[in-house]
Amino acid sequence: VEGYADPHTWHDPVFWTETVIAVAQSMSQDLDLMVSADRIATLRTAARLIDEWITQTFAPIPVEQRIVVSAHDAFSYYGKRYGVSLEPLLGLSTASETKLARVNELVDLIAERDISAVFSETSVESAGIAALREGAAQRGVDLRSMPPLYSDALGPADKRGGQYFGMLIENTINIVDAISGERPSLSPSAQIFLEAHGLLATETLL
């Protein structure tokens, strides 16, 4: 909503984890509950491992190539932390209307910067993204079909994207694939740690 702060802080794993810990500690004092120091340490380690992996994953990609076209402005915290330029079709609110001028602006960007993919999102209606695809096709650009990004909600509980750290992993894999054409693998140390502490589903990463 215009005039309100960006609420999408969960796309920065370190910032979000510290927020969750602070809220839990505050609530525990109000409700006279105990917050496990071991659990806090586990979450901080998990956030650090994911943060390091995402940073290392983007490291080989030149900054000028790190451009993501998405359905709405949900990934600014992610972009700021990892040096990714975000070009959303809509603003912070998914209720805003797609403007033809913005569609045309993004089509120009896609053609000029040789962007290979645009992202729909699991929680956003994708008509605007379809318009981008059509506009790009008219300019001779055949955009790749990519899985939608998780923006405002997690995925189904039985999928990797249904868990917080899994959501970050899947988004990163798909973003890097769209930019570089390569699908990175999660570091073994991060995967083992997350699975051992119930923070990541034990399924094969694509």
Protein language model features and the residues they cover:
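Extracytoplasmic metal-acquisition and chelation regions
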Residues: 1-206
